[in-house]
């Protein structure tokens, strides 16, 4: 029996907050008894006269985003005595959409029987060999469960020959959609034997969707094991979800289909037409997104018309539902930020720099941590309200008045990096440390040859050999070894964005307010296990009018003050490049964009009865919705990302290049990613040995990976006794084929795609997806504001070229006022305000987040093997918490422990402590566990 432990999807139906200040409600039990808390039962279902009793173990799977899922050992809700009819009863919990008003409730809901439920047999009719006719019943209102949920009941006369109930069908004759909670079916008077259909899905009015909604009992079946009476329903349900590929999708649709990213621009906007290349296809390879079917642009036949509605289509149960009182309204917030970035295009002082480094500090409210959280949404609600009323006024302010306006409107929290050490951003040691313990720890790689070489065409981009020579290296490492010895001993590491960025340098430099170089940064691993930066190389390729320019900068350069300031400028440039690659590649591409095809394919090819669907589904929660919002306001033409990061309008195109050149599914598993970058090797025993022993992201991540992999392997071995069962699973193979051929169609012919032909390959594939959606995303997302919220630490823009490139007046200005040149290189005040606001939002956990190791699917509790496997997984996460805490307090681990150092907690699971992960505590955005899914 479902208990009040699982939140409804999104707002009005979200999980209870740990704070009493928030008003919440959860899915109620369909039948609740005083003092009966959580009721799980042994189902004893039979006629009341001569039947024998059949015992089945029954549990539920609380689907995380609106689909009906679950597991039972056998759903034997049937009449044992085949000579009698039995009266069966169904109880149903329903929440009506807020679109249905008080009048609807009083008249339609109480006085009319608008909800119908059909019982479907799991057996075929022995005489016809066809599916039995369902038994229908009108559901009548029986009372209120609470302020949000209503209880309905129906009775059925079930013939003795009907057999076990294999499914229920639901029809909504009301004119408003409803959220279906639970359906419980049991012989009248035998509630303790009830089997629950955990639905948790929006049911549209029959005039919108003529198909009856189907929900299965909770037993997980491979396709070959499906009861004969519901085989057809299982297949038809998947056909409905696949759709026909035609027509524009409506908000109430549940259809999953694929399309290219052809909706980022807006060619039809008469005031500000924008076009962006189509992402997906031979020219710009890319993962596919959800098809909306909107008409093509009138002015650009390759582009889809931009949505004129606030909502971009995603299948109904993937969308956020009504937001509960006080919850974060991300759509409205991002809409206001988008309006602000649009306004920046015409603001006469949009490029205004900060007047001093101390002025940046004024963005943050020193007393923030002592402020009470506002009762209706806290800081985010405050920002939304003020943005609505004071946006235009803000544009009119000048100088110090504008800075004060930003401070008053946004009231930013002091980022943790600045709160712990105000000078951390300036120190080279911290610059290096953040490459392995910051917000983008998956770009650094081992240097395996010297000189470092480019793979670009020399005729176009200049000499292949890097300007960072052996002499430069040996001078910087004080000749403790030769450059060749440093390579051989695995002492040299680098961030290498040279080949990725260099082809875009001239394009980006034509844009206002940004500049670009091809870049590399080289680091040396010291004897105490920490990294030290030793060189930064910046390159501008030749053009028709100018020869190639490139220069290597080193700490202190020539030992002069001027050289020290040039080094700080060079750091600002490569930090901006790293911030762009982090946001566009490590974050958006590798998690959000690449995951959407897995979700689409799973819903098209895997039945909700399928065990693999149930394993993966918690990891897909809200991802399609957040991606749709991103296409509308974050990654679109002229959106927040283009206005805030170095590549500007080429941002998404650049991520396409990275997808084409770098992305491989088999390398997305953490161990394989580390090996590819040279950051780890496998020893003869198959164990990983890290190139940097104290590598916080890898140390913690491998613990998380191992726990996920073992959980997936045990799960797979339980449902597939032998490898042949995997190969013969038609739904599983169709899912994986569609991921390759449709979801990632531009890479479908690559030889590295794994075959699902063994327990190991299947477990590795599933674990890779589960890791990307949980650990990988947590590592790149939730540290954004704590680390990048202080602009000098992680500037997202570099607006001014290096003075040594230009020379003349630029160099003279730099010598006279180096701090001003550095501030002119950092993002402007406008850009900073936008970046901080969006990073603050993205780094904040949802109040109804589901965390790895703490969210248990009820379906697993009554299956002995799966329940034990999950308990072991849960115990593994608890041990990871202890290990991470121990490492963060170990003075020998200098990359995560030290004076003023931000500890690495992004991959620290939740330990269940009631004070751990309080969504109302806005100082804890980094310390709330690892969410299962990409939900922000």
Curated annotation (Swiss-Prot):
The lineage of its organism: Eukaryota, Viridiplantae, Streptophyta, Embryophyta, Tracheophyta. The N-terminus is blocked. CDD domains: PLAT_LH2 (cd01751). The keyword DNA-binding does not apply. Its main location: plastid. It comes from Hordeum vulgare. It is found in: Plastid, Chloroplast. One of its GO terms (biological process) is lipid oxidation. Fe cation binds at residues 587, 592, 777, 781, 936. Induction: Transient induction by exogenous methyl jasmonate, reaching a maximum 48 hours after treatment. Not induced by endogenous jasmonic acid resulting from sorbitol stress. Residues 47-59 have a biased composition (Low complexity). Binds 1 Fe cation per subunit. Iron is tightly bound. Residues 88-217 form the PLAT domain. Residues 287-297 have a biased composition (Basic residues). This is Lipoxygenase 2.1, chloroplastic. It comes from the Eukaryota. Its EC number is 1.13.11.12.
């Amino acid at each position: 029996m479902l208990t009040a432990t699982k939140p409804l999807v999104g707002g009005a139906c979200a999980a209870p907050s740990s704070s009493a200040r928030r008003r919440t409600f959860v899915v109620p039990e369909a039948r609740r008894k005083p003092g009966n808390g959580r009721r799980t039962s042994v189902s004893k279902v039979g006629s009341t006269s001569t039947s024998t009793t059949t015992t089945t173990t029954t549990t539920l799977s609380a689907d995380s985003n609106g689909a009906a899922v679950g597991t039972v050992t056998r759903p034997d809700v049937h009449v044992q005595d085949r000579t009698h009819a039995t009266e069966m009863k169904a109880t149903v919990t329903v929440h009506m959409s807020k679109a249905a008003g008080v009048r609807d409730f009083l008249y339609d809901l109480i006085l009319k029987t608008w909800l119908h439920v059909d019982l479907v047999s799991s057996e075929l009719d022995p005489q016809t060999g066809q599916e039995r006719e369902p038994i229908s019943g009108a559901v009548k209102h029986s009372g209120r469960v609470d302020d949000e949920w209503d209880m309905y009941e129906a009775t059925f006369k079930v013939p003795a020959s009907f057999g076990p109930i294999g499914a229920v069908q639901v029809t909504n004759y009301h004119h408003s959609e409803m959220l279906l909670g639970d359906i419980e079916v049991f012989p009248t008077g035998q509630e303790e034997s009830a089997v629950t259909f955990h639905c948790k899905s929006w049911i549209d009015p029959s005039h919108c969707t003529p198909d009856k909604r189907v929900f299965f009992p909770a037993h997980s079946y491979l396709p070959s094991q499906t009861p004969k009476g519901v085989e057809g329903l299982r297949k038809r349900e998947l056909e409905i979800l696949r759709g026909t590929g035609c027509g524009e999708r409506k908000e109430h649709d549940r259809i999953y289909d694929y399309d290219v990213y052809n909706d980022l621009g807006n060619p039809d906007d008469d005031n500000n037409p924008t076009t962006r290349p189509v992402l997906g296809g031979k020219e710009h390879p890319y993962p596919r997104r959800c098809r909306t079917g909107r008409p093509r642009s009138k002015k650009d036949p390759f582009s889809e018309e931009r949505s004129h509605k606030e909502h971009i289509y995603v299948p109904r149960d993937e969308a956020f539902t009504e937001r509960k009182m006080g919850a974060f309204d991300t759509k409205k917030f991002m809409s206001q930020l988008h309006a602000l970035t649009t306004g920046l295009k015409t603001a006469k002082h949009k490029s205004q720099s900060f007047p001093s480094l101390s002025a940046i500090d004024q963005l943050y409210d020193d007393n923030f941590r002592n402020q009470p959280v506002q009762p209706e949404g806290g800081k985010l609600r405050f920002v939304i309200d003020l943005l609505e009323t004071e946006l235009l006024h803000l544009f009119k302010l000048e100088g110090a008045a504008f800075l004060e306006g930003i401070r008053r409107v946004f009231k930013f929290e002091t980022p943790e990096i600045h709160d712990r050490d105000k000078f951390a951003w300036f120190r080279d040691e911290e610059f290096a440390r953040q490459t392995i313990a910051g917000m983008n720890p998956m770009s650094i790689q081992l240097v395996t040859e010297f000189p470092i070489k480019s793979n670009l065409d020399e005729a176009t981009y200049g000499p292949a050999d890097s300007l960072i020579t052996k002499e430069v290296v040996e001078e910087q490492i004080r000749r403790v070894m030769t450059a060749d010895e440093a390579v051989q001993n695995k002492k040299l590491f680098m961030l290498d964005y040279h080949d990725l960025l260099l082809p875009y340098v001239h394009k980006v430099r034509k844009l206002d307010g940004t500049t670009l170089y091809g870049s590399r940064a080289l680091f040396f691993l010291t004897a105490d296990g920490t990294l030290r930066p030793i060189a930064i190389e910046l390159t501008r390729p030749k053009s028709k009018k100018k020869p190639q320019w490139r220069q290597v900068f080193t700490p202190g350069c020539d030992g002069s003050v001027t050289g020290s300031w040039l080094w700080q400028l060079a750091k600002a440039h490569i930090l901006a490049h790293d911030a762009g690659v982090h946001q566009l590649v490590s974050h958006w591409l590798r998690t959000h964009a690449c995951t959407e095809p897995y979700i689409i394919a799973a819903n098209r090819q895997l039945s909700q009865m399928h065990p693999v669907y149930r394993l993966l589904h918690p990891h897909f929660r809200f991802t399609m919705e957040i991606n749709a919002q991103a296409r509308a306001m974050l990654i679109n033409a002229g959106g927040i990302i283009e206005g805030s990061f170095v590549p500007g309008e080429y941002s998404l195109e650049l991520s396409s290049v990275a997808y084409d050149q770098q992305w491989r599914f088999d390398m997305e598993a953490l161990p394989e990613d580390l090996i590819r970058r040279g950051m780890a090797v496998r020893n003869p025993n198959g164990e990983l040995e890290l190139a940097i022993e104290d590598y916080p992201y890898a140390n913690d991540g491998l613990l998380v990976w191992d726990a996920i992999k073992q959980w997936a392997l045990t799960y797979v071995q339980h449902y597939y006794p032998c490898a042949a069962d995997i190969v013969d699973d038609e739904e599983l193979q169709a899912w994986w084929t569609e991921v390759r051929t449709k979801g990632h169609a531009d890479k479908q012919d690559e030889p590295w795609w794994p075959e699902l032909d063994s327990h190991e390959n299947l477990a590795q594939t599933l674990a890779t997806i589960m890791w990307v959606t949980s650990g990988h995303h947590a590592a790149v997302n939730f540290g954004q504001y704590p680390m990048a919220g202080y602009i000098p630490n992680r500037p997202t823009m570099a607006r001014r070229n290096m003075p040594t490139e230009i020379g003349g007046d630029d160099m003279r200005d730099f010598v006279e006022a180096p701090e001003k040149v550095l501030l002119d290189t950092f993002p402007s005040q406008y850009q900073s305000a936008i970046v901080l606001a969006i990073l603050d939002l993205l780094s904040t956990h949802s109040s109804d987040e589901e965390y790895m190791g703490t969210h248990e699917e009820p379906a697993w509790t009554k299956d002995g093997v799966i329940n034990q496997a999950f308990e072991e997984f849960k115990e593994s996460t608890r041990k990871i918490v202890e290990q991470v805490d121990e490492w963060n307090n170990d003075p020998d681990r200098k990359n995560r422990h030290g004076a003023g150092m931000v500890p690495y907690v992004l991959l620290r699971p939740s330990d269940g402590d009631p004070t751990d992960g309080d969504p109302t505590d806005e100082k804890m955005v980094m310390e709330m566990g690892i969410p299962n899914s990409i939900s922000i």
